[in-house]
């Protein structure tokens, strides 16, 4: 039993070392502005009589960057490409999403925090919105 526990500890240590070695190299230029680039917007075929649209945005927050409180009237699935995203939706605990991690946001959740967790490096993520055709992707919250 002790040998099995020891092998597990060694395997975990080796995996951690490999994962650290495979991290992306830090960026040499620092982007201090928030950038949003539409990657895709495609109307989907009607399903059960509902017309939907999927839109993919690439969002970049510069070091210390963030957005103001807002909500999305549609489902959002996101994936962090680089850096660490700090997020807090009303009624939920604050969360950190690192490069390679994904997140889900229910429609109309109020985003109290959407920010770069770093003061040195930008964070970049893809946000996949699935909405009604006429729905705006984001609405400011006073």
Which functions belong to the PLM regions below?
Residues 73-92, 99-101:
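Glycine- and acidic-residue-biased ligand/ion/polar-headgroup-sensing regions
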Residues 58, 63-65, 81-84, 89, ...:
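Sec/Tat-exported extracytoplasmic proteins
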Residues 93-94, 107-136:
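Ligand-binding loop in jelly-roll beta-barrel domains
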Residues 61, 90-109:
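Short acidic-glycine-tyrosine-enriched beta hairpin
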Residues 66-68, 86, 101-103, 107-116:
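Histidine-centered metal-chelating micro-motifs
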């Amino acid at each position: 039993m002790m040998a099995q526990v020891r092998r597990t500890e060694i395997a975990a240590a080796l995996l951690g070392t490999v994962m650290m070695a495979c991290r992306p190299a830090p960026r040499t230029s620092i982007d201090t502005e928030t950038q949003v680039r539409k990657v895709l917007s495609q109307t989907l075929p009607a399903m059960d009589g509902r017309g939907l649209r999927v839109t993919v945005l690439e969002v970049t927050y510069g070091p210390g960057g963030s957005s103001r409180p807002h909500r999305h009237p549609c489902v959002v699935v996101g994936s962090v490409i680089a850096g660490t995203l700090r997020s807090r939706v009303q009624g939920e605990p604050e969360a950190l999403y690192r490069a390679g991690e994904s997140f889900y946001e229910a429609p109309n959740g109020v985003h109290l925090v959407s920010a770069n967790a770093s003061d040195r490096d930008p964070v970049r993520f893809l946000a996949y919105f699935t909405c009604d055709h006429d729905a705006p992707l984001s609405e400011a919250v006073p």
